[in-house]
């Protein structure tokens, strides 16, 4: 009788072990717990123990512990062999192969698979073949991997039609499709990859395999990243992450999520975040002992360093990754790492007139290796580099061969690939002496970039997209400068300048959720500030705010873009007509030299200005002395000394930037800066005194915005015309944030300027929601508040209101905006300048949303000292003057008063935008 219970326990243990094995793909943590429970029983018979060890090993591998999994599965295979469980032993070897691969034992992994395949038949053998395909993919043997997947699929498809459930393997088919999908992406077969991944997801859903469902979403996100649809990729990554979190530790069950997100961040130009993600992925992989993942993460980190211009760090990480790949027999990945290393070497000397000859030979070898291993996109990029270097060395034969190969992908693949191919084609035509053909190729490449940018809804992603077309614009500008035609130089200088501002604004998705995140961030930031003021530790509030910033950025990036690209081209004839008697100055930087195109009375002239390095130093001196002036206002003699130093340095900068232009006297001027020139306090330069001065991010944008008016009718309106801004029917909002010296008095004085029809928000009434509502219901807004420009994260640049900080993200939620905004808030006009003179900051965000003119400071300003200047500006606006004219007259009055405070305020304020006096409210 004693044997009865034991006899019954044997099949129960086997059933429990089998259940644990079946659970691995769905919930590896629970599968591990169940397998351990079976193994703890001394009565467990050999087959049940083998299956439990198999389940435990697979669960360990799924939770990113490949070393532990290898040891467990090795013991399982040994035990199965000793008890003559041949089928179990063979299938365990299939699982063991991936653990061996992950821990660097590539040859052993392939031997285990060979042994397994010989011992298996039917769908079990197909699983072994699938596993070999996955191993080949990890080795970089992409075509071999595809062949194995296709061979295994045939067996699994045949079994799919049988009525015998034991002969079918729908889960095996789903896993095959999910593994083949990313391989097809790497081979450039995006449509076929999408079919695989969608079918894999449907099968996984039907089978109730939650972990596999998450992985199909993860791989679809990878596909959309390569396709260039970043908002869709972000949404899919978010969905996959939520599914992973519902199952267990994301870091353990999805160790590649970090590296794949890093690739997305790189594609979006978010370099700092990408580098952080790659560094974290390296650390996670080192902890887990997954040598393959470590090497791949190092390669991504190298790419992040390369994109950031940190060439030494990029080369070091790439070389280290190449060594790791070589040690594990991954020759294809060695080529990929060498590709990144040589990119760092080439880009580091790209401005050199004569690059070292050795680089061409090295690059040619790497391009051939990349092509042989199936890395087509990377081979194209290297061939483009080879062509450029060969042109510099006069080896046109080498250049033509390399560029012809690189140009083959003009009409297929991702946006980045097509842009690179058009660049190669332009270079090839340039070498052949076909300059018109080269320009057509450049314009085609930039059109691809415009279409790609239009897909993006988030301002941040749109601004970063210009980096993909930097080389195209550089070559186009070079051709124009060589030919010396000022109008062509202006057109090419404009072609990528602040192009993101030409697109219609996109309201971020999930508005209620984003609003909640912003409110919580405001509270956390406020808590940190109050703790600091009270002498307490602000670390808790800062940490919460930092976490919320990441969530806000992620949510805002989900916005869908427009259906069609905006036309960013500059029509010089239309621009000349709309300028009237004004003068346009567009600054252009090329190879370290600053020049300018001056457009006046329909005639364009080209002026050389000087060394960009010297000018940048002068700008730093001017800004430093302006800040010192602002801080010393009210301190008697020290303020006077600071004012004189500021005037002296401003005179030097005026001599460098304005004197060479030889501007006609008395004309209004529109200045289009570039690079560091966006930080210039232009109204401090004497050559621009006594002029209506407008700053615009782009001549084409200024022209297009002015074109939406009805000149010359708008120009002829008298000050008392009811359609003129400031007339009695206009909706005017007056806002003064907290802790402003004289803020309440300033609003009271402005009420007298505009009369009773004003909405006033002062002190506690000036909350974020109240100010946003006022923005949506006003034609003109005056918003005085303490401002803060966030160089580390420009979208969090802010204005301090009664209940916290108003950010660029808040502004982007507006449905309509005023025509004109006056923002006497420190640094409100300061911007972060990205590739292509794309701008991120408070004032640039307002222009994107439809505000036509912004008057704001590009530096610090003293609070109460600005009141006389601001009042004078509003008096001019009330009389119907254009914003630039109102500011110019107010500046003249301030200079006449002659005090240091007047000088500090008048020098910092700028009129930015289209200088538009139209009174209709702009829809965002």
Language model feature labels by segment:
Residues 2-5, 419-420, 435-690, 715-719, ...:
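Amphipathic alpha-helical protein-protein interaction segments
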Residues 10, 47, 87, 123, ...:
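Residue signature of alpha-solenoid helical repeat architecture, marking inter-repeat boundaries
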Residues 13-14, 51, 91, 127, ...:
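Residue register of alpha-helical TPR repeats
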Residues 31, 69, 109, 145, ...:
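Single-residue signature of alpha-solenoid repeat helices
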Residues 36-40, 75-84, 114-121, 150-161, ...:
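Amphipathic alpha-helical segments of tetratricopeptide repeats
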Residues 197, 675-677, 708-788, 823, ...:
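A domain-level signal for caspase-like cysteine endopeptidase catalytic cores
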Residues 789, 794-817, 863-924:
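Caspase-like cysteine protease fold
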């Amino acid at each position: 009788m004693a044997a009865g219970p034991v006899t019954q326990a044997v099949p129960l243990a086997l059933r429990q072990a089998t259940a644990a094995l079946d659970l691995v793909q769905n919930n590896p943590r629970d599968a591990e717990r169940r397998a351990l429970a079976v193994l703890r029983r001394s009565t467990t018979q050999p087959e049940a123990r083998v299956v439990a060890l198999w389940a435990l090993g697979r669960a360990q591998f799924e939770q990113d512990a490949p070393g532990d999994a290898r040891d467990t599965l090795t013991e399982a295979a040994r035990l199965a062999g000793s008890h003559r469980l041949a089928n179990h032993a063979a299938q365990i070897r299939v699982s063991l192969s991936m653990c061996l691969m992950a821990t660097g034992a590539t040859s052993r992994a392939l031997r285990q698979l060979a042994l397994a395949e010989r011992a298996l038949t039917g769908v079990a053998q197909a699983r072994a073949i699938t596993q070999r395909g996955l191993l080949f993919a990890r080795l970089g043997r992409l075509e071999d991997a595809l062949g194995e997947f296709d061979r295994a699929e045939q067996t699994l498809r045949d079994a799919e039609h049988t009525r015998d459930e034991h002969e079918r393997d729908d889960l095996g088919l789903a896993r095959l499709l999910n593994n083949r999908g990313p391989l097809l992406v790497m081979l450039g077969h995006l449509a076929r990859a999408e079919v695989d991944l969608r079918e894999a997801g449907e099968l996984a859903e039907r089978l109730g395999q939650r972990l596999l469902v998450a992985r199909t979403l993860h791989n679809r996100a990878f596909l959309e990243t390569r396709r260039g649809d970043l908002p869709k990729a972000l949404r899919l990554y978010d969905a996959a992450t939520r599914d992973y979190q519902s199952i267990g530790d994301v870091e353990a069950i999805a160790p590649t999520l970090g590296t794949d997100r890093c690739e997305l961040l790189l594609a979006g130009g978010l370099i700092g975040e990408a580098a952080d993600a790659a560094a974290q992925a390296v650390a996670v992989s080192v902890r887990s002992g997954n040598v393959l993942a470590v090497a791949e993460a190092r390669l991504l980190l190298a790419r992040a360093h390369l994109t950031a211009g940190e060439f030494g760090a990029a080369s070091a990480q790439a070389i280290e990754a190449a060594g790791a790949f070589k040690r594990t027999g991954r020759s294809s990945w060695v080529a990929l790492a060498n590709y990144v290393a040589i990119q760092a070497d080439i880009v580091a000397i790209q401005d050199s007139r004569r690059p070292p000859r050795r680089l061409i030979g090295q690059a040619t070898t790497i391009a051939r290796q990349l092509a042989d291993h199936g890395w087509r996109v990377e081979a194209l990029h290297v061939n483009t580099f080879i062509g450029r270097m060969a042109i510099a060395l006069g080896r046109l034969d080498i250049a033509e061969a390399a560029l012809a190969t690189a140009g083959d992908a003009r009409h297929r693949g991702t946006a980045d690939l097509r842009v690179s191919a058009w660049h190669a084609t332009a270079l090839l035509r340039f070498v052949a002496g076909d300059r018109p053909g080269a320009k057509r190729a450049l314009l085609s490449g930039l059109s691809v970039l415009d279409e790609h940018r239009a897909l993006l809804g988030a301002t941040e992603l749109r601004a970063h997209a210009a980096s993909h077309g930097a080389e195209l614009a550089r070559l186009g500008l070079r051709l124009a400068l060589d030919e010396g035609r000022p109008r062509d130089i202006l057109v090419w200088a404009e072609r990528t300048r602040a192009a993101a501002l030409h697109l219609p604004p996109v309201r971020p998705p999930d508005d209620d959720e984003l609003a909640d995140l912003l409110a919580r961030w405001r509270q956390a930031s406020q808590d940190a500030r109050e703790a600091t003021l009270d002498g307490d530790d602000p670390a808790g509030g800062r940490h919460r705010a930092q976490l919320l910033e990441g969530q806000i950025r992620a949510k805002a990036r989900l916005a869908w873009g427009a259906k069609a690209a905006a036309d960013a081209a500059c029509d010089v004839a239309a621009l000349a007509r709309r300028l009237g008697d004004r003068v346009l100055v567009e600054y252009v930087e090329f190879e370290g030299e600053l020049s300018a195109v001056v457009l006046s009375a329909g005639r364009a002239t080209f002026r050389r200005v000087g060394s960009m390095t010297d000018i940048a130093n002068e700008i730093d001196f001017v800004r430093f002395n302006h800040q010192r002036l602002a801080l010393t206002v009210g301190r008697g003699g020290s303020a006077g000394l600071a004012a004189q130093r500021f005037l002296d340095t401003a005179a030097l900068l005026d001599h460098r930037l304005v004197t060479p232009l030889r501007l006609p006297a008395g004309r209004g001027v529109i200045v289009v800066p570039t690079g560091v020139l966006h930080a210039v306090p232009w109204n401090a330069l004497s050559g621009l005194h006594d002029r209506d001065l407008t700053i615009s991010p782009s001549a084409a944008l200024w022209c297009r915005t002015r074109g939406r008016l009805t000149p010359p009718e708008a120009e002829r309106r008298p000050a008392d015309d009811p359609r003129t801004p400031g007339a009695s029917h206009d909706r005017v909002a007056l806002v003064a944030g907290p802790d402003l010296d004289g803020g309440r008095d300033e609003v009271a004085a402005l009420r007298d300027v505009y009369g009773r029809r004003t909405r006033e928000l002062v002190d506690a009434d000036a909350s974020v929601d109240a100010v946003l509502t006022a923005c949506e219901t006003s034609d003109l807004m005056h918003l005085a508040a303490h401002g803060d420009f966030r160089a580390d994260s420009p979208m969090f640049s802010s204005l301090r209101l009664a209940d916290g900080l108003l950010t660029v993200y808040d502004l982007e939620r507006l449905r309509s905006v005023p025509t004109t905004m006056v923002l006497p808030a420190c640094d409100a006009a300061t911007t972060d300048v990205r590739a292509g003179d794309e701008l991120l900051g408070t004032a640039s965000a307002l222009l994107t949303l439809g505000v036509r003119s912004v008057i704001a400071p590009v530096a610090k300003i003293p609070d109460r000292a600005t009141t006389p200047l601001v009042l004078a500006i509003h008096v001019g606006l009330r009389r119907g003057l254009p914003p630039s004219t109102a500011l110019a007259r107010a500046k003249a009055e301030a200079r006449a008063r002659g005090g240091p405070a007047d000088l500090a305020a008048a020098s910092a304020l700028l009129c930015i935008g289209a200088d538009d006096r139209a009174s209709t409210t702009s829809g965002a």
